[in-house]
Regions:
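N-terminal binding-site loop/beta-alpha segment at the start of enzyme catalytic domains
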Residues: 1-65, 82, 126, 193-197
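Active-site mouth loops of central-metabolism enzymes
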Residues: 10-21, 70-79, 109-118
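Short acidic capping loops at alpha-helix termini that bridge into adjacent secondary structure
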Residues: 12, 61-65, 95-99, 137-138, ...
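Conserved, mostly hydrophobic/aromatic
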Residues: 15, 37, 51, 67, ...
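Short, acidic/polar
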Residues: 19-30, 77-92, 145-151, 171-172
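Beta/alpha (TIM)-barrel catalytic core signal, keyed to glycine-rich beta->alpha loops juxtaposed to Asp/Glu
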Residues: 22, 104-206
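A short, structured active-site edge motif that brings together acidic residues
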Residues: 63-75, 99-105, 164-167
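CE4/NodB-like, metal-dependent polysaccharide N-deacetylase domain
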Residues: 81-102, 129-133, 154
Length: 206
């Protein structure tokens, strides 16, 4: 277990739910002992409902699980973040989350039909509100670079508990990991074996 700076315990290894992971695979993950499940609101890559269905059938107490979800970048902004959060609770069939992260610091590509209501700074304030209410046990960010994380650390009332980033043998993320270590923020890596695609420029991709 990793201990976040607020004392919350988080499993060291989790089951990533990107790529439209379905209930049978999730039930298998539960049966072999996975207890951390990482999902997100972005239906472009994730299906929170499948996670919720698996948990409902998995015969594991909610208190034994660590559920992480992430805000869709189209909902950046104070009001929209607070409005979007309950959707994750409903889809995951839970009354609280163990961690809720900003998925990206901004919208990009085709993710957003229009500009979000606000920016990541306003959205972070909303996460701090959710944390103060006890609706989430830890808050953090995903896909923030060192400069953006430093900006967050400079303005946050609640220091992020968790920073999630892609890391594999070709992307060690040393500056970001060092920044997290200096501030007592837990670094969490995803896609550590490599991204799930064949790419001659990425020899470690799986």
């Amino acid at each position: 277990m990793a201990t976040l700076h607020n004392g919350v315990l988080m499993p060291m290894v989790g089951f990533g739910c990107a790529g439209y992971v379905r209930k049978p695979a999730l039930l298998d993950a539960l049966s072999v002992g996975y207890r951390l499940f990482d999902t997100a609101q972005a239906h472009e890559w994730y299906l929170e409902e499948e996670v919720g269905d698996a948990i409902a059938e998995g015969h594991v107490n909610r208190s034994e699980l660590f559920l992480t979800s992430k805000l869709h970048p189209r909902d950046l902004g104070a009001t929209r973040t607070l409005e979007a959060f309950p959707d994750s609770l409903r889809r995951l069939r839970t009354t609280y989350l163990d961690a809720f992260l900003l998925h990206y610091p901004r919208c990009f590509g085709t993710l957003c039909a229009k500009e979000p209501e606000g920016d990541w700074r306003a959205a972070w304030g909303a996460l701090e509100t959710l944390y103060a209410r006890g609706e989430v046990r830890a808050i953090g960010v995903s896909n923030f670079g060192p400069a953006e994380l430093q900006q967050l650390l400079d303005v946050a009332k609640v220091k992020p508990h968790l920073v999630q980033s892609w890391m594999d043998p070709l992307h060690a993320e040393r500056p970001l990991r060092a920044l997290c270590a200096r501030h007592g923020v837990q670094f969490q890596a995803y896609s550590t074996p490599g991204l799930p695609r064949q790419d001659s420029s990425q020899p470690f991709s799986a």
